[in-house]
Amino acid sequence: MQAHTRPLVNDIDLNDIAGGDGYLFVRDGVGIAGRGVAARVALHDVAEVLSAIDHVDEVGGVHPLAIGSIPFEPGTPCELIIPRVVVGKAADGRRWVTLIDDAQFDLDAARSVARPQPRAQAFTVAPLTGIDHYLTAVAAARDAVRSGLLTKAVIAREVVVTSPEPIDVHAVLLRLKASFGSSYRYSIDGFIGASPELLIAVEGNSVRCHPLAGTTARTGDPESDKRAAAELLASEKNQIEHRVVIDMIHDTLLPWCSYLDWQPEPSVISVANVQHLGTALDGHLSDPRPNVLELVTALSPTPALGGFPRAEALELIAKAEGFVRGRYGGAVGWVNAAGDGTWAVAIRCAELSADGRQARLVAGGGIVAESDPLSELAETQAKLQAMLSAIIRP
């Protein structure tokens, strides 16, 4: 393959480049959008294929890339996509387009595409995981922790949204932009969402993570939310849940790093519908530095979505939940030919059916010894609101 990167002068909205049938990974307007498919490449071949692309770079520091999602269950085969057209926007304001082989791109035409207009549409929402089943699974995970088999396990449940006509992906992405602009918003082969959680970002030898664990709902009232945030910070249950995640990520990354630092205490990270405990980690990768995909596969799923110890938690999840998570709880993002990339935890998401008329939503919570099943149910309800409102809102 051959690639040609040239600068773009005019501003762009990556949501409009991706539309309803392209690829998107963006946060605060910075990220990438893709159109078409130059190749689908098995995960273990991605680094080699990207490095073999003959690339002319008129911008400087831009590399061919692949975008995709990695399923929750470790070792599940998957492919990343090398788009025929990639439009990118950096934090420093640089904008560019990369074309693979004979691909063409008309910026004016892309910018003039009409945005979807509000319209009436009928939806039904139904649980795929029965409430009693979910509560029983949470209790089983809690009892496993109390007995010493686990330190933590994450139990999730499914709901399905159905419409007589296809769900408008472009409209959903624009609603997510309005409500969750500072989350990592993504759209890849019918998998859409807005994740607040950075799994890993690598640029040169710099590495960053910002894991989240421990959650409380937002009410919309500033004073109530302030009290809830203080209670979240003071909650021993949520602090334990959070500490398990931080310790695992620290211990996993440290062998690759010459330097790794993290916040001594978690802070509260607020998004539109919930508040989380979050801890930022920053480090310097040792030479020879790993490809970001090596770090993604080493970290994912973190205890924020699986549990700890990992093998025992995944075994319990498989038995207790009663469904296959698929791409939920895995990782979503991009990697370039230099081995750099940004990946988020695949949460606050929906997976669309082939005809676009159904969306499967999944949400879960971390279970420790002090977890209460009804409180965990309420937490999943709060988390599901992110995608439910984006899909159903006219």
Language model: regions and residue ranges:
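Conserved hydrophobic core element of enzyme catalytic domains
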Residues: 280-394
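SIR2/sirtuin-family catalytic core signature
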Residues: 157, 162-208
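Short beta-strand elements
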Residues: 84-89, 196-216, 345-354
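A short, Trp-centered hydrophobic/proline-enriched beta-strand micro-motif
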Residues: 20-28, 65-67, 151-153, 181-187
